[in-house]
């Protein structure tokens, strides 16, 4: 189910579907602000002949941190979630790393030294992303859609996603049905973290 409001957070690799209600004629800016910065960009929706005023590239205040307490995620509910089913396999996925040296890991290993997260095709899997670092990580799984089922130990019937944001020192559980037998990438979508090792594979066997 959707949220009503005028401001929504989004992590790297995520998407928003916006249903806008615009009254009458005029011009309406739809802006995106970068976390911790005054910089912003966006677009302007306008009816024919509307006056469009120039908007400064910098906002008045730094944009707030994104969903650091998972309050937005907690409000989200899937309109058509996964069928109810007991998990056949669970994996703890530990997210870690450091600024000095700048290295980011999954289950203590960088890409190339990783151990795959395994499943068999058709199994209901629960992945528990446990972030033990002081940076947030938008975790993305290729080839699958999962449903958020736990936030810091609290069971939820949450959103369906392919990228979920895991704030610092937090845990997010997601459930999915393992798809085609293949090696699917599982990684942080913050590119500097990905480039320094924060990737593993979700290995599905037949």
What are the residue ranges of the model-derived segments?
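Short amphipathic beta-strand starts and helix->beta connectors
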Residues: 1-4, 157-159
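C-terminal soluble interaction/assembly domains
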Residues: 136, 146-181, 185-187, 193-206
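Short, conserved phosphate/pyrophosphate- and ester-handling motifs at nucleotide-, phospho-/glycolipid
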Residues: 13, 142, 169
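Beta-strand signatures of extracellular beta-sandwich domains
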Residues: 138-140
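His-enriched metal-coordination microenvironments in redox/metal-binding proteins
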Residues: 130-132, 142, 148
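Extended terminal and domain-junction accessory segments
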Residues: 3-126, 133, 179-183, 190-206
């Amino acid at each position: 189910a959707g949220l009503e409001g005028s401001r929504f957070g989004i992590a790297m690799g995520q998407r928003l579907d916006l249903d806008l209600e615009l009254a009458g004629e005029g011009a309406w800016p739809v802006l995106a602000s970068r976390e911790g910065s005054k910089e912003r960009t966006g677009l302007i929706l306008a009816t024919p002949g509307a006056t469009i005023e120039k908007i400064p590239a910098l906002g008045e205040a730094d944009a707030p941190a994104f969903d650091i307490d998972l309050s937005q995620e907690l409000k989200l509910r899937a309109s058509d979630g996964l069928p109810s089913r007991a998990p056949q396999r669970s994996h703890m996925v530990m997210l870690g790393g450091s600024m000095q040296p700048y290295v980011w890991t999954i289950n203590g290993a960088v890409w190339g030294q990783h151990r795959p997260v395994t499943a068999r095709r058709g199994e209901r899997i629960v992945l528990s992303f446990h972030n033990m670092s002081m940076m947030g990580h938008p975790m993305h799984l290729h080839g699958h859609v999962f449903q958020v089922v736990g936030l810091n130990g609290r069971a939820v019937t949450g959103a369906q996603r392919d990228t979920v944001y895991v704030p610092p020192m937090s845990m997010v559980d997601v459930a999915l049905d393992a798809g085609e037998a293949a090696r699917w990438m599982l990684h942080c979508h913050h590119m500097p973290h990905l480039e320094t090792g924060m990737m593993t594979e979700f290995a599905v066997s037949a």
